[in-house]
């Protein structure tokens, strides 16, 4: 029995205008009112997606969000951390060494803000990520704290060849995923959205047999594979669609709502 619906945002729940459609909003609100837990799963911090949380009414004491691609499970009302997994500064040193050798712009994030390393300008992350503090500093001044991830954010034309040339030993040091055409993320090795969802399911006394997930990209792969119902958008990547329980319509054609309307017909 499905008790939780977990949703990626970009190119999944959100349309190309970065909006939740009226149809998707209506269906998810109805499920939430019927006691189904609706959980947004994102690589972003909670402040950056707060308008979507409010739009869906996910502000009850038992509402949670999976942020930082599973690195932080946070209560929407109290902001208490149910689960977190990060990296030390020393874990980032291999990546620092590589971007220095190639002069690639890099951002690193803790669980509250973005550190924009200004050694090599050109990052477009400020235009992509809203409602979060940015602090510019040189790589030499990076503080000794816990980090959620590192991000290369440059135009797809520049990023694509960089990804193709990433050394295997560097990728092996992290859970490296391309979350959007202009974003490459470097996460803790064992981190993914499925890990965050497992912590949340455990909290409620449930398991993956009670989970439905929606996604489209590489950073959704593990949660699509783990869930009893792993649903991928028609616009999703071929390798992600290959492990899906089912394929639904595109993000611009209310794919989330269309699938839920069929699956939860007796509730809606």
Specify the residue positions occupied by each region the protein language model found.
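Non-catalytic pre-domain segments flanking phosphatase-related domains
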Residues: 1-7, 26-29, 33, 206
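Hydrophobic packing residues within well-ordered alpha-helices of enzyme cores
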Residues: 24, 49-53, 162, 166, ...
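Short, structured coil segments at secondary-structure junctions
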Residues: 61, 69, 170-172, 226-227, ...
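Mg2+-dependent phosphoryl-transfer enzymes with acidic/Ser/Thr/Gly-rich catalytic loops
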Residues: 1-4, 21, 185-268
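Short active-site oxyanion
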Residues: 35-39, 63, 149, 209-210, ...
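Conserved acidic, metal-coordinating active-site core of Asp-based
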Residues: 98, 102-214, 218, 223, ...
